[in-house]
A protein has these predicted regions:
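Catalytic palm active-site di-aspartate
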Residues: 22-25, 45, 56-87, 100, ...
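Cytochrome P450 core scaffold surrounding the K-helix E-X-X-R motif
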Residues: 27-35, 255-260, 307
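Metal/cofactor- and membrane transport-associated sequence elements
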Residues: 1-77, 82-105
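RNase H-like nuclease fold core
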Residues: 184, 243-265
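RNase H-like nuclease module associated with reverse transcription
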Residues: 114, 205, 243, 264-396
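C-terminal reverse transcriptase regions that engage the nucleic-acid substrate
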Residues: 2, 7-8, 109-232, 343, ...
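Mobile genetic element proteins and their domesticated derivatives, centered on retroelements
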Residues: 7, 22, 38, 49, ...
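Structured nucleic-acid-interacting core domains from mobile-element enzymes and related host factors
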Residues: 8-16, 224-248, 290-292
Length: 396
């Protein structure tokens, strides 16, 4: 999904054509009742796109590139039977579609407006693409027969007391809790980064005997928050050039069960994961023709961690930390990353580590390019009045 969002960001900025195809022969039609051994089919190696001049990206095997010197770049993103095609060359787009339809039974869906449950809204004047999942939220509410009674400005209370509980298999399951958490997890992965921290808490208790009514109540609060922010979407693209930056944060003190890690140690682990993702994104953007002009900047709000990485200091309290977690320091020494300090209030990653007050939560959502849309049709399932959080200015 990260590759898909990055591709859409580049496509929106360049104002490329964005179309989709759906293959009809991906799965076998018969129902197998016996164990059958088969030889690998000739088409399994994927020679169709190679014959059309596409090469597989070394960064993501589902991304195929064709970068001729005389024609605009052409990108194809494949997910099982769904293909996303992006290029500025309309004649080449029609030719590739025709060749694919000759080799496979597929349906031309035209311009991309939905993908894997995501609604895609494009504003070519502003060169933006907005991703939403309001339809999926409505389906989840209908399937669970959920009716909200109170709109929420945040997905999780900043005073929550959810913590680890001993396993008690005699406790009856509190509703469809695992199913609900799974649905919310997919929303968070695709278009709702504001749900990352609440789901990191709720997902710890999906096992039978682990969740109690209070956990189900917390999950229902997330649903109320989704009702309040149903028309909000993730905005990609814009006219500014691509600048790759990252934010890392950790909050071991907010762990109500244990607080065993020091703040510096937790920040080192978080910095290593963020540096790894930035390093990978650098290669992905290079494949898409948007190689960063300077090393990406990783912002952290812990000065102790910054000192260990920048000054190559050795402290007796950090000797137990494996060297692999000092990836940020290694990349900085190579000139492939730059570490910088940022105040906690300006650290975007803070929303991923703790439950915030409504004003702080909304501010970080804005920093994540997560805005309210000027489209009230997604509120038809609920009240004719606009829900909380929708009456905001559409921002670029």
């Amino acid at each position: 999904m990260t590759t898909f969002r990055v591709l859409l960001h580049v496509v929106a900025q360049r104002d490329y054509e964005l179309h989709s195809l759906e293959l009809s022969t991906t799965f076998l039609q018969g129902s197998l009742h016996e164990e059958i051994w088969l030889r690998r089919s000739p088409g399994f190696t994927g020679t169709t796109l190679a014959a059309l001049g596409f090469a597989r990206s070394t960064t993501d095997p589902s991304l195929f590139l064709r970068t001729d010197t005389t024609l605009p770049p052409f990108y194809i993103l494949v997910y099982v039977d769904d293909l996303v095609l992006a290029t500025a060359y309309t004649a080449g787009l029609a030719h590739v579609k025709s060749e694919l339809q000759k080799r496979h039974t597929c349906t031309d869906l035209g311009e991309l407006c939905s993908y894997l449950g995501l609604q895609i809204t494009r504003d070519r004047a502003w060169r933006t693409i907005t991703l939403t999942q309001s339809h999926m939220v409505q389906q989840v509410l209908q399937r669970l027969n959920f009716t909200y009674s109170l709109l929420q400005a945040t997905p999780l209370s900043s005073r929550h007391s959810l913590s680890a509980l001993p396993l008690d298999e005699s406790v009856e399951p509190s509703g469809p809790y695992p199913e609900l958490v799974g649905c919310l997890m997919y929303l968070m992965t695709c278009t709702r980064p504001d749900l990352a921290y609440p789901l990191s808490i709720l997902a710890r208790y999906v096992a039978p005997g682990r969740h109690r009514p209070e956990h189900m109540d917390a999950a229902k609060r997330v649903l109320c928050y989704l009702c309040s922010t149903l028309c909000m979407g993730l905005v990609l693209g814009g006219r500014a050039r691509v600048v790759l930056t990252g934010h890392a944060d950790a909050s071991c003190v907010d762990d109500l069960a244990t607080q065993r890690s020091s703040s510096c140690e937790a920040e080192i682990y978080a910095g290593a994961m963020a540096a790894q993702e930035l390093h990978w994104l650098t290669y992905l953007l290079t494949d898409l023709g948007e190689a960063p002009r300077s090393p990406p900047v990783l912002y952290v709000d812990n000065k102790a961690m910054l000192a260990l990485c920048q000054e190559h200091r050795l402290e007796h309290r950090t000797k137990h930390i494996a060297l692999c977690y000092f990836l940020a320091r290694e990349l900085q020494q190579r000139g492939q990353l730059r570490l910088a300090y940022v105040a906690t209030r300006a650290n975007t990653a803070d929303i991923f580590t703790k439950a915030l007050q409504p004003c702080d939560h909304q501010r970080f959502c804005t920093m994540l390019a997560f805005f309210a849309l000027l489209d009230w049709s997604c509120d038809l399932l609920f009240s004719p009045t606009l829900p909380m959080g929708v009456c905001q200015t559409y921002m670029i």
